[in-house]
Amino acid sequence: MARMKHTARMSTGGKAPRKQLASKALRKAPPPPTKGVKQPTTTTSGKWRFARFHRKLPFQGLVRKIWQDLKTHLRFKNHSVPPLEEVTEVYPCQTIGGCY
């Protein structure tokens, strides 16, 4: 290994001065209490997505159960279930609509 040269380093004269702690304490202070009734939180986009996904689960379970009776070991992609749901809703409406 090659020999490394040691360069002289200037001393800083001890520790560097620190910031005042009062400003840090002010930032961490709790917010002032609000008066009146607390507003309910609005739903975020993530919650809305979960609600839409959760709504599709019962129909998807029904489709899986029906197909398990016909054939075993079938897998469904997420985008294949909504068209089935749409057709399932439209067919009875058209059938009943043509009766009267």
Swiss-Prot record:
Region (Disordered): 1-46
Transmembrane segment boundaries: none
Keyword Cytoplasm among UniProt keywords: no
Keywords: Chromosome, DNA-binding, Nucleosome core, Nucleus
Superkingdom, taxonomy of origin: Eukaryota
Subunit structure: The nucleosome is a histone octamer containing two molecules each of H2A, H2B, H3 and H4 assembled in one H3-H4 heterotetramer and two H2A-H2B heterodimers. The octamer wraps approximately 147 bp of DNA.
Protein name per the record: Histone H3-like 2
Gene that this sequence comes from: gcH3
